[in-house]
Amino acid sequence: MERARRRGGGGGRGRGGKNVGGSGLSKSRLYPQAQHSHYPHYAASATPNQAGGAAEIQELASKRVDIQKKRFYLDVKQSSRGRFLKIAEVWIGRGRQDNIRKSKLTLSLSVAAELKDCLGDFIEHYAHLGLKGHRQEHGHSKEQGSRRRQKHSAPSPPVSVGSEEHPHSVLKTDYIERDNRKYYLDLKENQRGRFLRIRQTMMRGTGMIGYFGHSLGQEQTIVLPAQGMIEFRDALVQLIEDYGEGDIEERRGGDDDPLELPEGTSFRVDNKRFYFDVGSNKYGIFLKVSEVRPPYRNTITVPFKAWTRFGENFIKYEEEMRKICNSHKEKRMDGRKASGEEQECLD
């Protein structure tokens, strides 16, 4: 039995490789076979669910992204409550005998759209950090070369004191909150490199059931190597473009036509650039205002119902400040005139 299982698992892995065509990004409707072959524990846990209610959850599309030693499977599924995205992270060891580790993350397509926007911010921040890190690494290599030329009695420590005290330094953090769930995004760095951790937590309650039919158990976490954030984001964008509109229409009731939103705009002031982007989700329309000064980015989201008050307050403070500036200018001019008249009298 044990040999038969191993042979079946090996054959499944081979078929999974053929289905995806060996590319880092793939799309296949035969994905459940490849999925079960890569991590059979997932298939074993899903089999009772499928036997009890195979018609409850329908798989619409799937993509696979390979980043270093990890594989990320992005599955768009549909249940009676709507469409959702299931992300599975699979880590495969060097040899066949190594254990296969996996983790997963489940989120609605509306949250996936916000995750896509957040990934854009993290990608931009990571790009600036990369430039900084390259300069620091170049300078650090020079320091190491000079140290090697010097003779010391005691060997140098393998890592710096700062890295020992802070093995995981946080470079950027953000979060998304929806219903009874929170999604924390943390860009971190350790000795192995930089990575993005996406962690989902759920607020528990008596007899509460998760949105996608799962009980509210432990938190879900995936870890994405920073080098693959762009490829992961691109796969997410394509799935949202293909299947996200249906989810939004279902939440609206399917009767209203999608609203045409104004185009975004931006302008530069000194060394800062301000972006104005109008978006919408199941909670309504909002304005996303971003202040960008590399490598920093600050963003606020203003709901549509508060736009009028925001505009009124902006105009109010602009008028008051203009009056204050004009009054100050007039006082300075009067002071100069008075000093000039006094000088004429003295002459």
Curated annotation (Swiss-Prot):
Expression by tissue: Isoform 1 is expressed in testis and glioblastoma. Isoform 2 is expressed in fetal lung.
Modified residues (Phosphoserine): S160, S163, S339
DNA-binding region: 51-293
Ranges of biased composition (kind: Basic and acidic residues): 134-146
GO MF, one annotated term: RNA polymerase II transcription regulatory region sequence-specific DNA binding
Compartments where located: Nucleus
Biased composition (Gly residues): 9-24
Top-level taxon in the UniProt lineage: Eukaryota
GO cellular component: nucleus; synapse
Biological process annotations from GO: regulation of transcription by RNA polymerase II
Main localization (coarse): nucleus
Keywords from the UniProt entry: DNA-binding, Nucleus, Phosphoprotein
PANTHER family per UniProt: PUR-TRANSCRIPTIONAL ACTIVATOR, PURINE-RICH ELEMENT-BINDING PROTEIN GAMMA
UniProt record similarity statement: Belongs to the PUR DNA-binding protein family.
Listed name of the protein: Purine-rich element-binding protein gamma
Organism this protein belongs to: Homo sapiens
Taxonomic classification: Eukaryota, Metazoa, Chordata, Craniata, Vertebrata
Gene name tied to this protein: PURG
